[in-house]
Amino acid sequence: MQAARGGAGRPGREGRGLERECERSPGPGVAMPPGPCAWPPRAALRLWLGCVCFALVQADSPSAPVNVTVRHLKANSAVVSWDVLEDEVVIGFAISQQKKDVRMLRFIQEVNTTTRSCALWDLEEDTEYIVHVQAISIQGQSPASEPVLFKTPREAEKMASKNKDEVTMKEMGRNQQLRTGEVLIIVVVLFMWAGVIALFCRQYDIIKDNEPNNNKEKTKSASETSTPEHQGGGLLRSKI
């Protein structure tokens, strides 16, 4: 009889408890429930009420945030931003942050705010992080958003990028100054050439205007030397 109840050997605690529940005989006129043992009515009612309450809470809780992105990424800080559905009233947010492959978790929560971004600080450079975002409403918290993985840059890389930008700006300024100087030199040379050409044209006009007077003087001097006159006014004649 003992082997039939609990199998071979003595029955365990679960077997004895089941036997006690099943050995309780109902009152007169009450039918026995089917099976070896039926759940008590109170336990079934509590389970049903718990399921209904859980379903109601899940129906009223907000949806998970969408479009979760990480921007303004630096070696020791970053900014997480997200969006929520328009027809949902959200009064806060909760962010869980952890390193990849590390169980340590940082939890950031803020209520009575409508902001859609949060700054992450005290990050380690060249490290991968995972963040989840949850929306908070009066009914409770939403499910966690899709995980977002990001990696912080190295401080040396950030400084190198910054120095490269500064060098580029300086080179652009120097090139602009050189171009301005070259333009000024070209303009000065052009003005000088224009002045030289104008002076040459003026001298050429003066020489051209004086040329007829010189020709008249040359003709007059040539005529005087070719026909010499006598002191008395007559021409000299040779004696034969």
Swiss-Prot record:
<keyword id="KW-0472">Membrane</keyword>
<dbReference type="GO" id="GO:0005179">
    <property type="term" value="F:hormone activity"/>
</dbReference>
<keyword id="KW-0372">Hormone</keyword>
<keyword id="KW-0964">Secreted</keyword>
<keyword id="KW-0325">Glycoprotein</keyword>
<keyword id="KW-1133">Transmembrane helix</keyword>
<dbReference type="Pfam" id="PF00041">
    <property type="entry name" value="fn3"/>
</dbReference>
<keyword id="KW-1003">Cell membrane</keyword>
<feature type="compositionally biased region" description="Gly residues">
    <location>
        <begin position="231"/>
        <end position="240"/>
    </location>
</feature>
<dbReference type="InterPro" id="IPR003961">
    <property type="entry name" value="FN3_dom"/>
</dbReference>
<feature type="transmembrane region" description="Helical">
    <location>
        <begin position="181"/>
        <end position="201"/>
    </location>
</feature>
<dbReference type="GO" id="GO:0005778">
    <property type="term" value="C:peroxisomal membrane"/>
</dbReference>
<keyword id="KW-0812">Transmembrane</keyword>
<feature type="compositionally biased region" description="Gly residues">
    <location>
        <begin position="1"/>
        <end position="10"/>
    </location>
</feature>
<feature type="short sequence motif" description="Microbody targeting signal">
    <location>
        <begin position="238"/>
        <end position="240"/>
    </location>
</feature>
<dbReference type="GO" id="GO:0005576">
    <property type="term" value="C:extracellular region"/>
</dbReference>
<keyword id="KW-0576">Peroxisome</keyword>
<dbReference type="GO" id="GO:0005783">
    <property type="term" value="C:endoplasmic reticulum"/>
</dbReference>
<dbReference type="InterPro" id="IPR013783">
    <property type="entry name" value="Ig-like_fold"/>
</dbReference>
<feature type="compositionally biased region" description="Basic and acidic residues">
    <location>
        <begin position="210"/>
        <end position="221"/>
    </location>
</feature>
<dbReference type="GO" id="GO:0005886">
    <property type="term" value="C:plasma membrane"/>
</dbReference>
<protein>
    <recommendedName>
        <fullName>Fibronectin type III domain-containing protein 5</fullName>
    </recommendedName>
</protein>
<feature type="domain" description="Fibronectin type-III">
    <location>
        <begin position="64"/>
        <end position="155"/>
    </location>
</feature>
<dbReference type="GO" id="GO:0090336">
    <property type="term" value="P:positive regulation of brown fat cell differentiation"/>
</dbReference>
<feature type="region of interest" description="Disordered">
    <location>
        <begin position="1"/>
        <end position="33"/>
    </location>
</feature>
<dbReference type="GO" id="GO:0014850">
    <property type="term" value="P:response to muscle activity"/>
</dbReference>
<dbReference type="InterPro" id="IPR036116">
    <property type="entry name" value="FN3_sf"/>
</dbReference>
<feature type="glycosylation site" description="N-linked (GlcNAc...) asparagine">
    <location>
        <position position="112"/>
    </location>
</feature>
<feature type="site" description="Required for dimerization">
    <location>
        <position position="106"/>
    </location>
</feature>
<feature type="compositionally biased region" description="Basic and acidic residues">
    <location>
        <begin position="11"/>
        <end position="24"/>
    </location>
</feature>
<dbReference type="InterPro" id="IPR052120">
    <property type="entry name" value="FNDC_type_III_4/5"/>
</dbReference>
<feature type="region of interest" description="Disordered">
    <location>
        <begin position="210"/>
        <end position="240"/>
    </location>
</feature>
<feature type="glycosylation site" description="N-linked (GlcNAc...) asparagine">
    <location>
        <position position="67"/>
    </location>
</feature>
